[in-house]
Amino acid sequence: MSDLLIQNATMVLPHTTVVGDLLIVNGQISSIQPGGGIVAEEHVQTVDATGLHLLPGMIDPQVHFRDPGQPEKEDLYTGSCAAASGGVTSFLDMPNNVPSQTTLQSMHEKIATANHRCVTNFGFFIGATETNVEELQKAVGTPDAPIAIPGICGIKIFMGSSTGTLLVNDSDALEVIFTNTAGLIAVHAEDEDRMIEREKMIEGRTDMAAHAEWRDDETALIATKRAVAYAQATGHRLHILHLTSGIEADWLNGITSMYGQEGEAHVTTEALPQHLTYDERDVERLGTRLKMNP
């Protein structure tokens, strides 16, 4: 990457927004000058960003690019291009591919593919099953001997059935995973037992409202509480994916934090734009495009 000076940009910094200059040298930010005034050397490309905002590249912590197995939906190249076009410069991809990515070998193959196809930074979760803890340990290590393999960002656990065949609902299996692995565990938090029971309530229905009634807020909250309990008992790093309800957010208040202490559970979560802007009242207008688990 050539050296670049961006001048007169409205720069979004951690705690404020200021107009100024930003200098990139050898592909890295070298200087940020509120108010401007950076003088570029002759070889440096200069961009006048007056009236424009300058933000850090965004990180999308949950994408489903369906590569390998279903490239007709999206693949690593098209997905990363779409990300880059929207200002997302890093993504973390999920393991419910065809086949599911549940072994270290499959992760190495996926990383090799990404090295040739992706136009952005990337990371991949290895999928947990009820019987693959040894493969998880190969990918992320154990609490006493953590491993950091470039391209592997953590373990994904589906606590409730969703797209694909990955499911870990058994309490003993969950305890084994939380107790015997290192790194980050990210969970799809829906309670499988409650979903099985509530599915009877919507039998025969084909309306979209049935989906939200079946996979309700309480279904998510039960699994969230369960995952946090395992994390706190083992001191594991935990990320609750796609938080969907106010009751979950209220319950997690005081539990989640940006920073964690060594050896203690560190819990984080995320909210997706669609969960902040749509609800069941929008289904009649937009239909199945709003269907998502949870």
Report residues per predicted region:
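Residues at the N-termini of beta-strands
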Residues: 31, 90, 121, 151-154
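Divalent metal-coordination and catalytic microenvironments
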Residues: 9, 27, 51, 62, ...
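Metal-associated gating/positioning segment near the N- to mid-region
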Residues: 52-117
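A glycine-rich helix N-cap at a beta->alpha junction
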Residues: 112-128
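Histidine-rich, glycine-flanked metal-binding segment
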Residues: 2-57
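Divalent metal-binding segments
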Residues: 64-73, 89-104, 123-135, 158-169, ...
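Fold-independent oxyanion-binding glycine-rich loops
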Residues: 8-9, 14-15, 49-50, 57, ...
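Histidine/acidic residue-rich metal-binding segments in metalloenzymes
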Residues: 134-294
